[in-house]
Amino acid sequence: LPNVVLTPHLGASTTEAQEAVGIEVAEQIADVLNGGVIRNAVNMPSMDANAVKVLGPSIDLGGKLGTLVQQIAPPQIATLRITYWGKIVELDVNAVTRAIQRGFLRRISGDSVNFVNAPVALERLGVRAEIVKSTDDSGYSELIRVEAITPDDTTFSASGTFIGKSNQPRIVSINGREVEVAAEGKLLVLENLDQPGMV
């Protein structure tokens, strides 16, 4: 039913308590619809509407970068390092970080991974999360790099940014090689030995 909203049972055992919880949930939904803060969501960290508007594209790009890095990296990963440069370092990047972690884990753990449990799911796999906000010049107004580092310190990475007046999401680096690829659809990544006679 499209008009039904369900919430988890919160332990309100009396009629009055259940009514109060119902009113509180309705007020929270009204707040979100009027541009307020997302509070007490079941599968999303709390964010105000302005943060959702500003970070929404980065959340989407981050998820795609996480998925890409997981697919180009081997199964044994010791550290997942996420580095931010540019304007984004001034913001709370928690939702972007969780989107990257969720994207990285999606093909491993399936749909059971969400924005709330992604950090814990990563930890359970023995992967250390490392978040860096860099003030160094990246050459872009905003850049996100995701690195999967193996136990022997081999790094597999992808970086993304937004290009042009319309802020089109682009993958600009894969494993340290500069590229410019739209961050959408399917992407075939091949690596071969760079030697004469090899195509």
How should these model regions be labeled?
Residues 1-2, 10-199:
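NAD(P)-dependent dehydrogenase/reductase Rossmann-like domain
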